[in-house]
Amino acid sequence: MAFDGTWKVDRNENYEKFMEKMGINVMKRKLGAHDNLKLTITQDGNKFTVKESSNFRNIDVVFELGVNFPYSLADGTELTGAWTIEGNKLIGKFTRVDNGKELIAVREVSGNELIQTYTYEGVEAKRFFKKE
């Protein structure tokens, strides 16, 4: 699948505004914008493993398409939701445990770039990753 590989964050678009809308404090927003996030994605049928490595944490996230699972953001925000594939996009629909509001994440590959788009409460942000 096109998502397989190791992806290193290259740049962000509107990411601090997104984090602000999520309620993340200013210090964590500044640090989060420079987290050096690296994603290593492997797919086996409907099962994905995403190794997240950053300045803040190293975790393995394992999920199956269409199956709800719990997930914590780097700042500790708890979510529950599922990923699905629509065309060439991996779409995550998550609900915050603390307030019930929806967070959408979309991953798509364009050339040697993985573009991850987040939408929360009308604020959209993008993170661009280069394939290593």
UniProtKB/Swiss-Prot annotation:
<protein>
    <recommendedName>
        <fullName>Fatty acid-binding protein, intestinal</fullName>
    </recommendedName>
</protein>
<dbReference type="Pfam" id="PF00061">
    <property type="entry name" value="Lipocalin"/>
</dbReference>
<feature type="modified residue" description="N-acetylalanine">
    <location>
        <position position="2"/>
    </location>
</feature>
<feature type="binding site">
    <location>
        <position position="83"/>
    </location>
    <ligand>
        <name>hexadecanoate</name>
    </ligand>
</feature>
<keyword id="KW-0446">Lipid-binding</keyword>
<keyword id="KW-0813">Transport</keyword>
<feature type="binding site">
    <location>
        <position position="107"/>
    </location>
    <ligand>
        <name>hexadecanoate</name>
    </ligand>
</feature>
<dbReference type="GO" id="GO:0036041">
    <property type="term" value="F:long-chain fatty acid binding"/>
</dbReference>
<dbReference type="GO" id="GO:0005902">
    <property type="term" value="C:microvillus"/>
</dbReference>
<dbReference type="InterPro" id="IPR000463">
    <property type="entry name" value="Fatty_acid-bd"/>
</dbReference>
<dbReference type="InterPro" id="IPR031259">
    <property type="entry name" value="ILBP"/>
</dbReference>
<dbReference type="InterPro" id="IPR012674">
    <property type="entry name" value="Calycin"/>
</dbReference>
<dbReference type="GO" id="GO:0005324">
    <property type="term" value="F:long-chain fatty acid transmembrane transporter activity"/>
</dbReference>
<dbReference type="InterPro" id="IPR031272">
    <property type="entry name" value="FABP2"/>
</dbReference>
<dbReference type="GO" id="GO:0006631">
    <property type="term" value="P:fatty acid metabolic process"/>
</dbReference>
<keyword id="KW-0963">Cytoplasm</keyword>
<keyword id="KW-0007">Acetylation</keyword>
<dbReference type="InterPro" id="IPR000566">
    <property type="entry name" value="Lipocln_cytosolic_FA-bd_dom"/>
</dbReference>
<feature type="binding site">
    <location>
        <position position="83"/>
    </location>
    <ligand>
        <name>tetradecanoate</name>
    </ligand>
</feature>
<feature type="binding site">
    <location>
        <position position="107"/>
    </location>
    <ligand>
        <name>tetradecanoate</name>
    </ligand>
</feature>
<dbReference type="GO" id="GO:0045179">
    <property type="term" value="C:apical cortex"/>
</dbReference>
<dbReference type="GO" id="GO:0098856">
    <property type="term" value="P:intestinal lipid absorption"/>
</dbReference>
<comment type="function">
    <text>FABPs are thought to play a role in the intracellular transport of long-chain fatty acids and their acyl-CoA esters. FABP2 is probably involved in triglyceride-rich lipoprotein synthesis. Binds saturated long-chain fatty acids with a high affinity, but binds with a lower affinity to unsaturated long-chain fatty acids. FABP2 may also help maintain energy homeostasis by functioning as a lipid sensor.</text>
</comment>
<comment type="similarity">
    <text>Belongs to the calycin superfamily. Fatty-acid binding protein (FABP) family.</text>
</comment>
